Amino acid sequence: MNKIAPAEIASMLNDWYLAIKKHEVEESSRLFEEVKPLLDDMEEDQEVLAYFSLLELRHKVLLHEARGQGFQHEEPSHMNATSDMLKYYFFLFEGMYEAYKNNYDIAIGLYKDAEQYLDNIPDPIEKAEFHLKVGKLYYKLGQNIVSLNHTRQAVKTFREETDYKKKLASALITMSGNFTEMSQFEEAEAYLDEAIRITSELEDHFFEAQLLHNFGLLHAQSGKSEEAVSKLEEALQNDEYARSAYYYHSAYLLIRELFKIKKKEQALSYYQDVKEKLTAEPNRICEAKIDILYAIYAEGGHAETFHLCKQHMDDLLSEKEYDSVRELSILAGERYRELELYKEAAHFFYEALQIEELIKRTEVI
């Protein structure tokens, strides 16, 4: 049997790469299934194999971002390619994977390594993608100004390219998230409104559910819990979204807002739904977060729940969920202060301050 020329496989990989860049989930999945079995029949070429391995990781990241799928990754044994472009992709994709695992310092180091080769990448979309990934990481770390600086560069490029509307919408969501955290709610809503206009043209209902979650987050942060609950419940009506890992983010936020507006029965109903789901699909992070909410709201936040809350906070710290610990520490502190349990309140407020200092020490690109 004749071997397939590496150039033929490389051409297919370029088509796959373009689908990934455009955030075309179904097309990316189709091309992955088409090209993977052909590698066994290809003439040996380490550069093409390395290119495939890097695109496979980026495809997994796309499925996580666009459909909430988890993934595992092992560094390929044939990563001995020498071109600057492959080195760039290697550091970028490995950084994306470490960010997914909440290994922030490692991710930032890998992004810095990738940045050394960025000037050698002629594609403006690829440069915009780099800035968007870095912007999302710093948003997750609560370093909003740094995140905005990177994300603005991505928005500028994606606005100029009509084939990358979903990427533009994704960047706009990150812009909105930063302004939400900075309590600049009008700016945040304007970016989300633009994103929803773009999304309505794409007919991607999963992405629409993600946007609804972000509207819920915006309303929650601006003190409009009723509106937040409405948007979050609407997001969870999308069956595919409700089956994805993003379900846990929306369910947690929904339970939190229901407790805040004293709709205890509804909050407990969702709490039980999540607990049942967790028996089949364990998620240590979500379980710790909703159990903290249960302890401080449903059980009254009395002194006996303090050690339980502390234990769950430690679980979140072990998973490097720093932003969650900061947020929940403030909630717990406020709750214990309301109950005049000042020693317990002081502990959690101090915990929030420690996390703030930890995040500030994170290296900046």
From Swiss-Prot:
GO cellular component, one term: cytoplasm
Lineage: Bacteria, Bacillati, Bacillota, Bacilli, Bacillales
Cellular compartments annotated: Cytoplasm
The name this protein goes by in its record: Regulatory protein RapG
Main location: cytoplasm
InterPro entries (alphabetical): O-mannosyl-transferase_TMTC (IPR052346), TPR-like_helical_dom_sf (IPR011990), TPR_rpt (IPR019734)
Domain of life: Bacteria
Activity regulation comment: Inhibited by PhrG.
Function as written in the Swiss-Prot or TrEMBL entry: Involved in the regulation of expression of DegU-controlled genes. Inhibits the binding of DegU to the promoter regions of aprE, coding for an extracellular alkaline protease, and comK, a master regulator for development of genetic competence. RapG does not stimulate dephosphorylation of DegU-P.
The entry's keywords: Cytoplasm, Repeat, TPR repeat
Loss of function: phenotype: Disruption of the gene results in the enhancement of aprE expression.
Ranges for the TPR repeats: 135-168, 169-202, 209-242, 244-284, 326-359
Similarity annotation: Belongs to the Rap family.
PANTHER family given in the database record: PROTEIN O-MANNOSYL-TRANSFERASE TMTC4 (PTHR44227:SF3), PTHR44227
Induction, per UniProt: Part of the rapG-phrG operon. Expression shows a slight decrease in stationary phase. Repressed by RghR.
